[in-house]
A protein has these predicted regions:
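N-terminal targeting leaders
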Residues: 2-166
Length: 166
């Protein structure tokens, strides 16, 4: 009897491992068209972020939730657009323009991602003060509800706080 239980456990573990491997190898795309752009590129050794890539199974899981986000705000008359994600296509070009025109960030390598009116900053800066200044600058852009600051000082790969491009 114990051999049977062991065999079942081995089969279950193998099935889980096979499923995880299949998901890891599944093609991943920016299925939701989340805006993801490089804003500056002064530090060529800066680790490149992966960006918003999803496997087909993840897209199916997230589609309903993403379709609903921001609907109650719109119905109450507090929001201009019926879905939080619809703002991102407008916000990210304004963020890019603002950061490029500012002049304080020309010595950085920065990528920005827009998801649900939240702007995620990824890349490399010269100092912690510069990272804070970048975050504060992005908070000033119209329609931005928040900023996720994943910037790192310098270009060391081991200091990266975001998934890297493959």
């Amino acid at each position: 009897m114990s051999n049977r239980l062991l065999w079942c456990a081995v089969l279950a573990a193998s099935a889980c491992a096979a499923q995880a491997l299949a998901q890891a190898q599944a093609p991943r795309t920016n299925a939701f068209n989340d805006p993801f752009v490089q804003v500056t590129s002064a530090l060529p050794a800066c680790p490149v972020p992966e960006g918003p890539l999803y496997a087909e199974a993840e897209v199916r899981e997230l589609a309903h939730v993403r379709a609903q986000h921001g609907g109650s705000c719109y119905r109450a008359g507090r929001c201009r657009l019926p879905n939080s994600y619809l703002y991102d296509a407008e916000i990210i070009p304004r963020v890019r323009l603002y950061l490029r025109e500012d002049g304080r960030f020309d010595d950085t390598s920065i990528w920005v991602l827009g998801e649900r009116r939240l702007v995620t900053l990824m890349g490399c800066v010269q100092s912690a003060e510069q990272a804070r200044a970048l975050e504060k600058a992005v908070e000033l852009v119209d329609d931005v509800m928040g900023v996720v600051n994943l910037l790192q000082v310098g270009t060391e790969r081991s200091a990266t706080r975001y998934p890297l491009a493959r």
